[in-house]
Each structure stands twice: as structure tokens, then as C-alpha cells.
């Protein structure tokens, strides 16, 4: 599975971008908000969600981990697939969605073309508990880790990434806490690299 791509923007379409990684062009679908921030010829890192189906393999790219999380979160709603999830994220930021769901504001979703009253209601109802869980977990992480440069949701993703790389959850949380305490402005990439380096040096 592809987790991220770092490369140069070769070209763009209405709903996708071609990222050139060492001469190989990857077609990556993205939201309008993400596409609007990409410039041809410039280098970017995109967080990738890979969808493997019998008839195709599609890559979906995001400039932030938050957008990737909400892309998957939206698809947990009955009636929302990848295209609709991207369409919603083209109109609303993850923060917009979080606030709307917490406030039970269906109108913000109904204002999006293709989202009717019933779907707007399902989004609010089905995401209410999930968004609240993200909010609460993020607040706890932010408070305990004193995060400045790294957002709460992103820090949680770093912990998950470290667990996938062989850390126990306890080890991952302690590693992230220790590193950010020493360097609150550290980037996500450097945080993961430092955690891995520190772990390897202990063996």
C-alpha cells in the first residue's frame, strides 16, 4: 500500500493531479481545496489513501492528515463513497465539518450540490459520536503533549503510524510525548524519524 508520495506536480485535471516521483507519474484524486493549493512544477508531499478494487487501484491524496481522516470518516456514512467524500471536502474543511456536526447544522451540508436533506441528516446523525470522539481524543493529546506545530489529530496519526511500524501503543505514546517535550516545533516527518532512530539505538 502507498502511504504517501513526495514528488513534483506534472499536471492537473478537474479532480486529480499527476505527481512525478523519480520519473514515474502517479494519478492521484484530490479535493478541490487540495488541488487549489498545488502548483505545476512544484514539489509536495501528499498523504495517500489507496483503494484496491478488482477492476482498479485508485490513489487519493491529501496535504494534511486531518483531511485524510475526514475523507475516511465521511465514507462511513451510508450513501457516501469516495467521489462524494471528495466533493464535500472540496466545499468544507475538516474543521467546518466537525463544527457543523457538533452543532447539528444540516444546512451547511444541504448547501453542497448533490447533498440532499436526507443525506445531510445522515451525515450529522452518523458522524456525531465519531467526531465527538476525535475532538475529545485530540484535546487530551494536545494537553498532554503540549503540541504546537503538530495538530492533535495529526499527532494521533503519528502514534498509529508508529504502532504499525512495530511499537506498542504505550511505547508510541511515550516516544511522541518525549520528543515533542524536547522539541515542540518538530515536523511530523522528523517526529517519526526521531522515534524510529531512538528506538533502534536502544536495541
Swiss-Prot record:
Subunit (UniProt): Homotetramer. Forms an RuvA(8)-RuvB(12)-Holliday junction (HJ) complex. HJ DNA is sandwiched between 2 RuvA tetramers; dsDNA enters through RuvA and exits via RuvB. An RuvB hexamer assembles on each DNA strand where it exits the tetramer. Each RuvB hexamer is contacted by two RuvA subunits (via domain III) on 2 adjacent RuvB subunits; this complex drives branch migration. In the full resolvosome a probable DNA-RuvA(4)-RuvB(12)-RuvC(2) complex forms which resolves the HJ.
InterPro entries per UniProt: DNA_helicase_Holl-junc_RuvA_I (IPR013849), NA-bd_OB-fold (IPR012340), RuvA (IPR000085), RuvA_2-like (IPR010994), RuvA_C (IPR011114), RuvA_C_sf (IPR036267)
Record's comment describing the protein's domains: Has three domains with a flexible linker between the domains II and III and assumes an 'L' shape. Domain III is highly mobile and contacts RuvB.
Native organism taxonomy: Bacteria, Pseudomonadati, Pseudomonadota, Alphaproteobacteria, Rickettsiales
Annotated Pfam families: HHH_5, RuvA_C, RuvA_N
Renumbered residue ranges of the record's region Domain I: 1-63
Region (Flexible linker): 143-149
GO annotation, biological process: DNA recombination; DNA repair
Region named Domain III: 150-203
UniProt entry tagged with the keyword Manganese: no
Organism: Rickettsia conorii (strain ATCC VR-613 / Malish 7)
Annotated stretches, region: Domain II: 64-142
CDD domains with a match to the protein in the record: UBA_RuvA_C
Key word DNA damage present: yes
Protein's name according to its UniProt entry: Holliday junction branch migration complex subunit RuvA
Broad class of where this protein is predominantly found: cytoplasm
MF annotations from Gene Ontology: ATP binding; four-way junction DNA binding; four-way junction helicase activity
Protein location: Cytoplasm
Family: Belongs to the RuvA family.
Function, in words: The RuvA-RuvB-RuvC complex processes Holliday junction (HJ) DNA during genetic recombination and DNA repair, while the RuvA-RuvB complex plays an important role in the rescue of blocked DNA replication forks via replication fork reversal (RFR). RuvA specifically binds to HJ cruciform DNA, conferring on it an open structure. The RuvB hexamer acts as an ATP-dependent pump, pulling dsDNA into and through the RuvAB complex. HJ branch migration allows RuvC to scan DNA until it finds its consensus sequence, where it cleaves and resolves the cruciform DNA.
